[in-house]
């Protein structure tokens, strides 16, 4: 059992820690940060997200969330119309009116986010000042914050990063030694991790963001935080500015990634090796057995990642090491080397890496490689399927619970399912 659990895996040859990266600066095809509201409004259960944007923003949110507006979801769009764009209306006065009406109708709201968009940035609407002004009117009943979900030079997962970074200055101060798990994960996954931490004797443990506005975790010099998502660079910097220290680790995708993630935490909190093995061992073995069936379908297959979610590097590591797949290119919108250093060290040596997007050039390389599966955005999937390539929507890997041991097989299945579908269609 020790051989299974006490792993400090040698990198595949020399890994990709110092590998050259192709920097692309061309045409892009990505969703904007507003997409993050879809999972954030489910995570923070008494928060409301008010997008200040266009009808296009409203259509995107409603379509992505799959929620009809008459169901009164905890998000909405304050539409910027022609009068606002022409400067004929006082946008701040209109915003105050909308917020006042919203909070009168929805007394259950405890935290309100004013979310900037491309249109609000174009007309230079200062939502941070608006949030301060409105907070004075509605405090302490409602906390009002602002962040940007604009798609200008960003990708869709950065909406969560800017949201959490805006929350960090509002967190209470604490000197207590504690663990903070940073990044939105499904409630069921959070509960699973909490049981593991309880078994290891690690505590107190806080998850950020919390499920309720009043339960946001404290932060200070005693805080040790570990990222659950690789796209939280601004949030990590904000926490470090508050005195917290980040624990470097691979991300908890797959049996190996989850074990190494927990191992980094256990080391920091001086968990005995025997206890770690007894708590983590059965869970890892169960995950490894569940993954074995999927490995037979994926081993030796080629995978190509278009830059979209910033999950690409950890997912490539999982597919290469645990599923036996061959990454022919791993493209990511932004390569934060410091955050993914542990992942890069575990990638197969010589794996082509690219940062940014030049869509036409990447399409040419993808067509030339003829991978067995392509991980890409929604806009590319159907055209590539029409060319005979099998695709997986990258946004599905964000929406689906894929962290931890119990979800490892679900993560693998997201890649086997498109291949099975293609096989049935051909037959």
Curated annotation (Swiss-Prot):
Its cofactor is [4Fe-4S] cluster. The gene is bchN. [4Fe-4S] cluster binds at residues 32, 57, 118. InterPro entries: LIPOR_BchN/ChlN, Nase/OxRdtase_comp1, Protochl_reductN. The lineage of its organism: Bacteria, Pseudomonadati, Pseudomonadota, Betaproteobacteria, Burkholderiales. Pathway: Porphyrin-containing compound metabolism; bacteriochlorophyll biosynthesis (light-independent). Its EC number is 1.3.7.7. It holds the Pfam family Oxidored_nitro. Component of the dark-operative protochlorophyllide reductase (DPOR) that uses Mg-ATP and reduced ferredoxin to reduce ring D of protochlorophyllide (Pchlide) to form chlorophyllide a (Chlide). This reaction is light-independent. The NB-protein (BchN-BchB) is the catalytic component of the complex. Keywords: 4Fe-4S, ATP-binding, Bacteriochlorophyll biosynthesis, Chlorophyll biosynthesis, Iron, Iron-sulfur, Metal-binding, Nucleotide-binding, Oxidoreductase, Photosynthesis. It catalyses: chlorophyllide a + oxidized 2[4Fe-4S]-[ferredoxin] + 2 ADP + 2 phosphate = protochlorophyllide a + reduced 2[4Fe-4S]-[ferredoxin] + 2 ATP + 2 H2O. Protochlorophyllide reductase is composed of three subunits; BchL, BchN and BchB. Forms a heterotetramer of two BchB and two BchN subunits. This is Light-independent protochlorophyllide reductase subunit N. Binds 1 [4Fe-4S] cluster per heterodimer. The cluster is bound at the heterodimer interface by residues from both subunits. GO terms for molecular function: 4 iron, 4 sulfur cluster binding; ATP binding; metal ion binding; oxidoreductase activity, acting on iron-sulfur proteins as donors; oxidoreductase activity, acting on the CH-CH group of donors, iron-sulfur protein as acceptor. It comes from the Bacteria. SUPFAM superfamilies: Helical backbone' metal receptor. Belongs to the BchN/ChlN family. It is an enzyme of class 1 (oxidoreductase). The keyword Iron applies. GO terms for biological process: light-independent bacteriochlorophyll biosynthetic process; photosynthesis, dark reaction. The keyword Ribonucleoprotein does not apply.
């Amino acid at each position: 059992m020790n051989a299974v659990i006490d792993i400090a895996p040698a990198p595949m040859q020399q890994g990709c820690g110092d590998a050259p990266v192709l920097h692309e600066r061309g045409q892009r095809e990505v969703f904007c940060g507003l997409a993050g509201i879809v999972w954030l409004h489910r995570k923070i259960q008494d928060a409301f997200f008010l997008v200040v944007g266009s009808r296009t923003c409203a259509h995107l949110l409603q379509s992505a969330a799959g929620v009809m507006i008459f169901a009164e979801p905890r998000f909405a769009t304050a539409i910027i119309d022609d009068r606002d764009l022409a400067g004929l209306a006082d946008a701040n006065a209109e915003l105050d009116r909308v917020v006042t009406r919203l909070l009168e109708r929805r007394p259950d709201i405890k935290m309100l986010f004013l979310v900037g968009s491309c249109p609000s940035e174009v007309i230079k609407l200062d939502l941070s000042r608006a949030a301060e002004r409105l907070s004075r009117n509605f405090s302490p009943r409602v906390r009002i914050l602002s962040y940007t979900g604009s798609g200008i030079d960003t990708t869709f997962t950065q909406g969560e990063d800017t949201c959490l970074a805006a929350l960090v200055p509002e967190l209470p101060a604490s000197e207590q030694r504690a663990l903070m798990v940073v990044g939105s994960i499904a409630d069921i996954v959070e509960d699973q991790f909490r049981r593991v931490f309880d078994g290891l004797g690690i505590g107190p443990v806080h998850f950020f963001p919390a499920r309720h506005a009043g339960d946001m975790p404290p932060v200070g010099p005693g805080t040790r935080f570990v990222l659950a998502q690789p796209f939280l660079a601004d949030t990590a910097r904000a926490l470090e500015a508050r005195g917290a220290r980040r624990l470097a680790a691979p991300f908890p995708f797959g049996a190996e990634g989850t074990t190494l993630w927990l191992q980094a935490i256990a080391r920091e909190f001086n968990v005995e090796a025997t206890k770690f093995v007894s708590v983590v061992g059965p869970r890892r073995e169960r995950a490894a057995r569940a993954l074995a069936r999927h490995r037979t379908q994926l081993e030796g297959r080629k995978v190509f990642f278009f830059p979209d979610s910033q999950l690409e590097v950890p997912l490539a590591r999982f597919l290469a090491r645990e599923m036996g797949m061959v990454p022919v290119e791993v493209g990511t919108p932004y390569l934060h080397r410091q955050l993914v250093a542990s992942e890069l060290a575990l990638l197969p040596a010589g794996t082509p890496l690219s940062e940014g997007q030049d869509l036409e050039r990447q399409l040419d390389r993808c067509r030339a490689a003829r991978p067995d599966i392509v991980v890409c955005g929604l806009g590319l999937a159907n055209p590539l399927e029409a060319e005979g390539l099998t695709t997986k929507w990258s946004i599905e890997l964000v929406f689906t619970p894929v962290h931890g041991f119990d979800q490892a097989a679900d993560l693998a299945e997201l890649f086997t399912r498109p291949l099975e579908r293609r096989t049935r269609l051909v037959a």
